[in-house]
Amino acid sequence: MKSSLKPVEKYAYSIFEIAKEEKKLDLYKHNLETINSIIEEVPAFFEAVGDPARDRNERKQIVIKNLEGEIDIYLISLIDLLIDVKSVKLLKKIVLKALDFVNEALSVKKVLITTAYELTKNQIDRLLQSLKKKYVCEKIEPIVVVDKSIIGGLSINFESQVLDNSLKTKLFNIVKKVN
């Protein structure tokens, strides 16, 4: 790995390398997703951990008390290190970049599905099965976004290919033809 990498990439790649060496890619994927969920759903937790007004050891104890046994010790050590170097604010970016490395190693592909309404689990599963057949890949993870501005239908973005079957686009194309 190049020495010109940014700190986020260095930390993320180090986590990925540990996961690979330990043969724990699936576990780290799950752990990284757990950390990301905590960051998004309980922002106060990492605000407390990153608060420089709090004692450093107290912040480390918060991490250990709440995450030990839930995530791998190397990831807890990463958070401890970020506390030491006053860079907890980088954790989300590190986690997302490490997830990119892990997903690539596990051959996991991401698909962005934009709909005007909430999809059921069954609808998502059927859509993923179709995509797996069409693109011949085993592991696809959906990112479902509800965007009422597309009016109806859906838009699928998979590996830089866009299938836009939204009502908004259809109407736009009709207007374009008329003008």
Swiss-Prot record:
Its main location: membrane. It is a peripheral membrane protein. F-type ATPases have 2 components, F(1) - the catalytic core - and F(0) - the membrane proton channel. F(1) has five subunits: alpha(3), beta(3), gamma(1), delta(1), epsilon(1). F(0) has three main subunits: a(1), b(2) and c(10-14). The alpha and beta chains form an alternating ring which encloses part of the gamma chain. F(1) is attached to F(0) by a central stalk formed by the gamma and epsilon chains, while a peripheral stalk is formed by the delta and b chains. InterPro entries: ATP_synth_OSCP/delta_N_sf, ATPase_OSCP/dsu. One of its GO terms (molecular function) is proton-transporting ATP synthase activity, rotational mechanism. The keyword DNA-binding does not apply. Belongs to the ATPase delta chain family. It comes from Ureaplasma parvum serovar 3 (strain ATCC 700970). It is found in: Cell membrane. Signal peptide: none annotated. HAMAP family: ATP_synth_delta_bact. F(1)F(0) ATP synthase produces ATP from ADP in the presence of a proton or sodium gradient. F-type ATPases consist of two structural domains, F(1) containing the extramembraneous catalytic core and F(0) containing the membrane proton channel, linked together by a central stalk and a peripheral stalk. During catalysis, ATP synthesis in the catalytic domain of F(1) is coupled via a rotary mechanism of the central stalk subunits to proton translocation. GO terms for cellular component: plasma membrane; proton-transporting ATP synthase complex. This is ATP synthase subunit delta. It comes from the Bacteria.
